[in-house]
Regions:
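Active-site phosphate/pyrophosphate-binding segments
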Residues: 1-136, 141-146
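Extended, charge-enriched "interface" segments that sit outside catalytic cores
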Residues: 142, 150-154
Length: 154
């Protein structure tokens, strides 16, 4: 839809994004921030936290760089046959898992090697999983259900 059509159709606001930004790079552009604002999220806090993480990921010391640590952990796991990443989130942020699933899927899968993200899967018994999985647990601060965490610890 073009802006003229949107005005004609009575849209209250039109937000323009940079068309060259896409996919995994769009979270902090209007493509990601407008929906976040509509949801009532604190954009100032999101921007501040993103800046902190951006600075941390620019650290030249690999031991102090969380981006390097994450890439290394996932890369080594995949090299050792753990090519499935199961994402477990607390209920308040369950939609984050879908976004991470997309992010991982489009960021890996190069040169015939991929990490397959799995989201919204109910956790089963530990012995029901093959040794091809890596689990990540993301939760918000506060009260939480210990059952998924206990399963992951096993």
């Amino acid at each position: 839809m073009h802006d003229g059509e949107a005005e004609q159709d009575g849209f209250r606001r039109i937000f323009f994004g940079e068309p060259t930004i896409g996919g995994r790079f769009s979270a902090l552009s209007p493509f990601g921030l407008v929906p976040a604002a509509v949801m009532g999220l604190d954009l100032g806090r999101i921007a501040a936290e993103a800046e902190v993480m951006g600075e941390a990921c620019r650290r030249p010391d690999a031991h102090a760089n969380p981006g390097v640590a994450l890439g290394l952990a996932l890369g080594l796991a995949a090299r050792d046959g753990r090519d499935k990443l199961t994402i477990v989130t607390s209920p308040e942020i369950y939609d984050l898992g879908a976004w991470l699933e997309q992010l991982v899927a489009e960021s890996t899968g190069k040169r015939g090697v991929a990490i397959i993200p799995v989201d919204l899967e109910s956790l089963g018994a530990v012995d029901g999983y093959a040794r091809d999985r890596v689990f990540v647990s993301l939760r918000v601060a506060g009260p939480w259900d210990a059952a998924p965490e206990e399963t992951l610890q096993a």
